A protein has these predicted regions:
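Thiolate-centered catalytic microenvironments shared by cysteine-dependent enzyme domains
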Residues: 2, 55-150, 171, 215, ...
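Positively charged, proline/Ser/Thr-rich regional signature most characteristic
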Residues: 2-76, 150-216, 254
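Short clusters of hydrophobic/aromatic residues that line enzyme substrate/ligand-binding pockets
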Residues: 120, 167, 260
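Extended, aromatic/histidine-rich regions of cofactor-dependent oxidoreductases associated
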Residues: 175, 238, 255-261
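Short aromatic/hydrophobic contact patches that present stacked aromatics
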Residues: 219
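Short cysteine clusters
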Residues: 222
Length: 262
């Protein structure tokens, strides 16, 4: 069984096209896939994580994602590489959802289809559903309960990738009942982790910005999980064991019992 990095580039994928244990999933949707896709890929829309992380919600989501994977012919025994239009906003959350459902080997193609140098295939791809049962990994998605339980835990980096104004409660979204940040979080602008849209900076630069050693555990959050999804792509590319907290401040701010700092 071949190893799979958390993030791969076009050269890595080109060298392995056609390998029998490699499945390439296009998360952009079936219409976009039909208009043009990486050779050998299939449409694989898994959706987005929910804004609330109640246990029953996460458990049901894991089952639903497992069903979607089976409908798209994904068994869990393959290496699964996901790509989007190029910014990571679609592929990175989809990767965490596949992990939540129990898929053990999932990667994201950095730069997505925009970075693919070869001619695209066109036309619809026929899917063959499979009958397998994945074992959910509920820990793949950080929840507000996990984040609260682990506040101040040595070795865990809690990374806020919002603006300085949001972090210090000098600005923010009016839909949030409270402003500030999760206690103990450090802040980095999401854009500081990238050289361009969907193109993470070199691993050494990202690690210098984060200030933690390669392999450290990082939970990233923002307002509603989009910026932190992109940040998670850069963090994983830099060698961190990174997860995106999809509920982010949108969820945390709604629970008056949860602490905050300004």
């Amino acid at each position: 069984m071949s190893d799979l990095p958390q993030v791969v580039d076009a050269d890595w994928l080109r060298a392995r096209l056609g390998e029998p244990d490699l499945v390439i999933g296009d998360v952009r949707g079936p219409n976009a896939h039909t208009r043009g896709h990486i050779s050998g890929s299939r449409p694989l829309v898994l959706g987005s994580p929910p804004p609330m992380s109640d246990p029953e919600v996460i458990e049901e989501l894991a089952k639903e994602i497992g069903l979607r994977l089976r409908r798209h012919g994904v068994t869990g025994e393959e290496r699964l590489v996901l790509y989007d239009r190029g910014d990571g906003v679609g592929a990175m959350p989809s990767a965490q959802l596949a992990e939540l459902a129990g898929h053990p080997r999932v990667a994201v193609l950095v730069g997505g289809i925009a970075a693919w140098p070869d001619e695209l295939d066109v036309g619809a791809v026929e899917l063959e559903p499979v009958k397998v049962r994945l074992e959910p990994r509920l820990e793949a998605l950080p929840t507000r309960a996990e984040v609260e339980r682990r506040l101040g835990e040595p070795g865990l980096v809690l990374l806020d990738v919002r603006t300085e104004e949001e972090f210090h409660a000098r600005g923010g979204y009016p839909c949030d009942p409270r402003q500030g940040h999760i206690p103990g979080a450090q802040r980095i602008d999401e854009e500081a982790l990238f050289d361009g849209p969907g193109l993470p900076k070199a691993g050494a630069e990202v690690r210098a910005a984060v200030g933690a050693h390669e392999g450290a555990e990082v939970i990233a959050y923002c307002h509603s999980g989009s910026r932190s999804a992109r940040a998670t792509l850069a963090l994983r590319a830099a060698g961190y064991q990174a997860r995106n907290y999809p509920g982010s401040w949108h969820e945390w701010s709604r629970h008056a019992e949860l602490p905050l700092e300004r």
